Amino acid sequence: VSAALTVQWASLTHSGSRKARNDDSFIAFASSPKGAETLPAHGSRSLENDDLVFAVSDGMGGGNAGDLASSLLLTRMAEIIPETFKTAAAGFFPDRLEYLRKAIQSVHEQINQAANNDETRGMSATLALTWFTPENLYLANVGDSRIYLSRAGKLSQLSVDHTAAWSSWKRGAIGEIEYRNHPRRSALYEVIGGGHAQVCPHFAAVPFVPGDSLLICSDGLIDGLWERHIADAMASGRPVWEIVEILAKRAIDNSGIDDTTLIVVRVA
């Protein structure tokens, strides 16, 4: 049996210049039969005994509703994901993507139920979640928080932005400049909460190899960065905390209006 791989990570969140409150939330936790263990802002951990989960959520809504939606979403995911170990111990091995689908739908309904007064009405959140197991990386996303993979110097977006403008860009109907200036670039047709009965996340299962790096981020980071900037920083081979600082500084210097949150993860 080959030695278990180690995951290194670093994270950062920065409040945008537009408002006092940061509506972004992020979480890093180790998932095991004992439950979820919250991880520090940066560190490294073996996949031998734990699954590792990293997620970013951008909350939307008036007052403190956005902050509430994003933090409620991630808190619940940290409660639900470790339950897979209990079902496995009982002899049932859940399909992790199906499990994630049910978990996200359940939190979607919970956020809708919590949006029952003037303060919280219409509150919603995006999600970009990566779940590392010893065999595979499972990911889920809703909205326009993103997950990128950098492998052998090549950057690919694993998540899907749930906007019509992004779809037009990806199928080549418009270029990156037109996309970035599109008036409806942030008009999301999928969110968690927001009053709709169902949510339809994007899911994927991706094998990972040593040397892979992942970026999980809110749209605030993307506002100030071209894709080539992300590709260059992710392929630089620098320590993960340094990549986080380089990307965040560049994004905030170039834009900085929206909240900016990112996690960089490297498999070693």
Give, region by region, the residue ranges found by the protein language model.
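PP2C/PPM-type serine/threonine phosphatase catalytic domain
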Residues: 1-268
